[in-house]
Regions:
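Residue(s) in the substrate-gating loop at a strand-loop-helix junction
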Residues: 147
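The beta1-alpha1 cofactor-binding region of Rossmann-like NAD(H)/NADP(H)-dependent oxidoreductases
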Residues: 43, 65-77, 109, 221-222
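Active-site helix of classical SDR
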Residues: 127, 163, 171
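Alpha-helical segment proximal to the catalytic Tyr-Lys
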Residues: 132, 175-180, 236
Length: 254
């Protein structure tokens, strides 16, 4: 029943929440009744979305500035969100980045560390802090947003793919660490048409679409089904899982 997806009375924290897939998740959580903490590096964008959520659904919502690639920022974000909302029932580690580079030999140490920091180190720290509180309290759900690059890496995004593969492994380990009260799962999105994709070459887009079994890129709202499933009681017996939402792009089952 639909009530299995109800999040009334819950608090969800979404990193990278002000745009793209993160924004869609925030909208979905608010629509399901959850209070929403929107976090990203840009406070203005987070606050604007929080105000939109409050106006459209009546839920509590607030924006938080945080660069989750930095350990100290993660610590401050956790304290600020718990101070504002009292708890976190759903953590979505969505913030990520895959900067372009001209060649593998030209990947700088700074770029490599930044990619690992944002896509792997930050999610670990947030999950460690919040998962510990969840396990000591009323439980909760942690959702790591990975990528099909974790299982189908490409040469022009290797640091990103390696970080996301690590995030998949982290998901399984965290599920063991925080069981039985906390469920930890991951979603591997394929290629979605977000604001980031607007600058892509149309010819390249067309060729890429033809390699996807469903013959198209995903629309941002299509991430919502898996997200609500994992956040809610609908997935009460699901933990340590990695779910592809990719139109069939990646091989196998992750």
């Amino acid at each position: 029943p639909a009530t299995r997806f109800d999040l009334t009375g819950k608090v969800a924290l979404v990193t990278g929440g002000s745009r793209g897939l993160g924004r869609e998740m925030c909208l979905a959580f608010a629509g399901a009744g959850a209070a929403v903490a929107v976090a990203s590096r840009k406070l203005d964008a987070c606050t604007a979305l929080a105000e939109e959520l409050k106006a459209s659904t009546g839920v509590r919502a607030a924006g938080f500035a945080s660069n989750v690639g930095r350990w100290g920022d993660c610590d401050r974000l956790v304290e600020d969100v718990y101070d504002a909302f009292g708890t976190v029932d759903v953590l979505v580690n969505n913030a990520g980045s895959s900067p372009h580079y001209p060649s593998l030999a030209e990947v700088s140490e700074e770029l490599f560390d930044k990619v690992i920091g944002l896509n792997l180190k930050g999610p670990f720290r947030l999950a460690a802090l919040i998962g510990t509180r969840m396990a000591a309290g009323d439980g909760g759900s942690i959702i790591n947003i990975s990528s099909v690059g974790a299982v189908a890496p490409v040469p022009d995004a290797l640091p990103y793919s390696a970080a996301k593969a690590g995030l998949n492994t982290l998901t399984v380990g965290l599920a063991l660490a925080f069981a039985p009260k906390v469920r930890v799962n991951a979603i591997m999105p394929g290629r979605f048409l977000t604001d980031i994709s607007q600058g892509w070459d149309p010819a390249v887009l067309g060729e890429a679409e033809r390699r996807i079994p469903l013959q198209r890129f995903g629309q941002p709202p299509e991430i919502v089904g898996a997200t609500l499933y994992l956040a809610s009681d609908a997935s009460s017996y699901t933990t340590g899982s990695v779910i592809k939402v990719d139109g069939g792009l990646a091989p196998g089952n992750g």
